[in-house]
């Protein structure tokens, strides 16, 4: 046991460093969990913080001990420091400092880096700075390095396959909404089952009672009772408990999700009926989203409103309408249709006949009911004007941007196509949203395949469950990054370096709360990068990313192997983006022309077609929907993580351990 005031300062300093390490871990790694949910608008930032605060602390307290032991005892060889435990404590403190410095720099730049790589690199720097190569368990490092490569590849591949299967079985079906209503409970079960297995079979919680346990292949009766050892000795009963727990969580989750998605669909339908489909999305998506659509789902969203209007307008001899102000009044005097009936084609024909053509503006589609006395019902007038003001501001901004784009095109008209693409990429004017040349801040404008809005709403509700899984999985894995070195210092001070390894629950809880605080204050920077700049994320895509990355992290955590949850999340995003459907040349030209307008107007039958039947997931990869330029920067930061953390830690440790004053003091003891 290392006690006394001389070493107490190391415990206090390590505790402070642990707090800042957990803080930046939450701002970087935990932000990855909610980046896809926030990027797809499935959950607000306030609700995300509430969910993260609770489940991060819960996951860290219940499940964080398994990987924490891997971080602190499977990388550094404690036997080398049996005679000098104070140097072990100093090295762990320096490792926390070195990793924190790099994570703070990366988070400030909005780069999603690996906290696991940071702390392992810092521990390697500490081990190398001691000058004793035996202080590092190199055989364990090999397994960790393999997981660094295997986990991202596995996450990206599984994400691509899962989205392809989901798109084929549900999203592209005409009755996708009816299918997902019947199947969403199964998706919830896929989320809860691995969590239940981890909770029962790999739970580091200790109960102060006597029980039958299995340790080192032998069944013994001992006290205290370790839950994971009890599960190993009673595998059948533990499996039954897992299934029952998963079923219970699925039932509760299904009930909650049913209420949430029905409420969201009702709100969406209400907005659609009042303001039309385009205006219904303005509040949710302030920026314009230019998408090619593979079915008539988005056009059919307003079918009820269109049928209502046509029912009043149709007569036996055709449709006769009288112009009333800026609107169009039908013959039965019960409905007033503001400019822009959903029948875009007939409206364009009328404009051509009158010698006028409207372009570059958004028109409001709204059914206004007329009272029996002929006066207009103005109950929704204020709300309509509010949204029309939003559209007007959008038009003004887009008209200015269109002028700039046109001037840029005129300046580049004498150059060849390749130089045009390069210049456009430099100006951030890539209409196709190509990741090679597109503006990283404008991935919301890429051309991707859209699905039924009501189906997407169900997936946006499911993202709440998948985000919770991601938080629990990352808390189980990432808590170790901050808590592991501090736990080594704390236990060495209290129990000695030869004492039994034990991670107290309050230390894990302290780490979980610190990470939640970091997410609340600085997490928005990484959320923007992963959730909004790499690819365009919709609820169905976000759910797939969160589900796969969470399952991969849980799998490696069950094995007790520390891995990068950041690499899993980003790799899932990239893997899904690479299997986005490709558009043919005609649709690309149509999209380019439509990009000059505020909203793309498409026909139902010609809106989206594939160049051919693509054999997924690896026959043809689509890089136009992935911001490869930003991913290249992120990938380089991954490589730099280990080197930077190791260098900074080695420098701090060398200065602290080998400074003359400290050595002289140690020699006089």
From Swiss-Prot:
MF (Gene Ontology): phosphate transmembrane transporter activity; symporter activity
GO CC annotation terms, alphabetical: plasma membrane
UniProt feature, compositional bias: Low complexity: 395-433
Residue spans, topological domain Extracellular: 1-6, 69-86, 130-143, 208-239, 524-542, 654-669
Ranges annotated as biased composition (Polar residues): 311-335
GO biological process: phosphate ion transmembrane transport
Residue ranges, compositional bias (Basic and acidic residues): 342-352
Record localization: Cell membrane
Stretches of the chain found on the membrane's Cytoplasmic side: 28-47, 108, 165-186, 261-502, 564-632
TM segment ranges: 7-27, 48-68, 87-107, 109-129, 144-164, 187-207, 240-260, 503-523, 543-563, 633-653
Topology of this chain in the membrane: Multi-pass membrane protein
Region (Disordered): 311-364, 392-444
Catalytic activity: 2 Na(+)(out) + phosphate(out) = 2 Na(+)(in) + phosphate(in)
Annotated keywords: Cell membrane, Membrane, Phosphate transport, Symport, Transmembrane, Transmembrane helix, Transport
Pfam families recorded: PHO4
Family: Belongs to the inorganic phosphate transporter (PiT) (TC 2.A.20) family.
The protein's role, per its UniProt record: Sodium-phosphate symporter which preferentially transports the monovalent form of phosphate with a stoichiometry of two sodium ions per phosphate ion.
Protein name stated in the entry: Sodium-dependent phosphate transporter
């Amino acid at each position: 046991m290392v006690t006394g005031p001389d070493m107490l300062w190391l415990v206090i300093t390590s505790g402070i460093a642990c707090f800042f390490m957990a803080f930046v871990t939450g701002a970087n790694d935990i932000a990855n969990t909610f980046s896809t949910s926030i990027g797809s608008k499935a959950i607000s930032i306030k609700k995300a913080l509430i969910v993260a605060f609770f489940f991060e602390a819960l996951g860290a307290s219940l499940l964080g001990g398994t990987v924490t032991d891997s971080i602190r005892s499977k990388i550094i060889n404690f036997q080398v420091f049996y005679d000098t435990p104070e140097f072990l404590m100093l090295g762990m403190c320096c490792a926390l400092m070195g990793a924190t410095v790099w994570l703070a720099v990366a988070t400030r730049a909005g780069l999603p880096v690996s906290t696991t790589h940071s702390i392992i690199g810092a521990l390697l720097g500490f081990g190398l700075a001691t000058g004793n190569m035996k202080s590092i368990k190199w055989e364990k490092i090999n397994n960790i390095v393999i997981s660094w490569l295997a986990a991202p590849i596995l996450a990206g591949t599984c994400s691509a396959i899962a989205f392809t299967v989901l798109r084929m079985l549900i999203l592209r079906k005409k009755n996708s909404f009816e299918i997902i209503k019947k199947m969403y409970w199964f998706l919830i079960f896929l989320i809860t089952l691995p969590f239940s297995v981890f909770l029962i079979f790999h739970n580091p919680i200790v109960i102060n009672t006597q029980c039958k346990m299995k340790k080192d292949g032998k069944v013994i009766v001992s006290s205290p009772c370790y839950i994971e050892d009890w599960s190993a000795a009673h595998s059948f009963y533990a499996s039954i408990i897992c299934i029952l727990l998963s079923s219970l969580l699925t039932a509760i989750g299904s009930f909650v999700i049913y209420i949430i998605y029905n409420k969201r669909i009702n709100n969406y339908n209400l907005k659609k009926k009042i303001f039309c489909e385009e205006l219904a999305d303005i509040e949710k998506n302030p920026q314009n989203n230019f998408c090619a659509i593979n079915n008539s789902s988005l056009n059919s969203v307003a079918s009820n409103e269109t049928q209502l209007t046509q029912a009043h307008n149709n007569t036996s001899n055709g449709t006769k309408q009288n112009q009333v102000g800026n609107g169009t009044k039908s013959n039965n005097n019960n409905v007033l249709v503001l400019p822009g009936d959903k029948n875009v084609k007939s409206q364009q024909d009328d404009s051509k006949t009158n010698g006028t053509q409207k372009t570059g503006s958004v028109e409001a589609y709204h059914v206004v009911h007329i009272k029996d006395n002929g006066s207009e019902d103005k109950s929704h007038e204020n709300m309509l004007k509010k949204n029309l003001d939003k559209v007007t501001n959008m038009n003004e901004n887009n008209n200015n941007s269109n002028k700039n784009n046109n001037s840029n095109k005129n300046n580049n008209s004498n150059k060849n196509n390749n130089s045009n693409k390069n210049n456009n990429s430099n100006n951030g004017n890539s209409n196709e949203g190509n990741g090679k040349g597109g503006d990283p801040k404008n991935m919301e404008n890429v051309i991707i395949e859209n699905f039924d809005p009501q189906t997407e709403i169900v997936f946006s509700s499911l993202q709440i469950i998948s985000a919770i899984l991601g938080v629990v999985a990352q808390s189980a894995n990432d808590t170790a990054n901050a808590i592991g070195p501090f736990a080594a210092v704390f236990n060495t001070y209290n129990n000695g370096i030869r004492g039994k390894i034990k991670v107290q629950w309050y230390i894990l809880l302290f780490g979980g709360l610190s990470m939640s605080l970091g997410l609340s204050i600085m997490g928005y920077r990484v959320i923007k990068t992963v959730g909004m700049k790499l690819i365009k994320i919709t609820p169905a895509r976000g759910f797939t990313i969160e589900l796969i990355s969470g399952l991969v992290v849980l799998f490696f955590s069950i094995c007790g192997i520390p891995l990068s949850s950041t690499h899993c999340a980003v790799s899932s995003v990239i893997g899904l983006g690479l299997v986005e459907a490709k558009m043919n040349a005609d649709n690309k030209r149509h999209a380019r022309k439509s990009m000059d307008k505020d909203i793309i107007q498409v026909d139902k039958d010609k809106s989206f077609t594939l160049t051919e039947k693509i054999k997924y997931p690896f026959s043809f990869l689509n890089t136009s929907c992935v911001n490869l330029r930003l991913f290249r920067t992120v990938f380089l930061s991954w490589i730099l993580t280990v080197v930077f953390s190791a260098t900074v830690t080695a420098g701090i440790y060398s200065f602290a351990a080998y400074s003359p004053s400290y050595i002289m003091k140690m020699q006089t003891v």
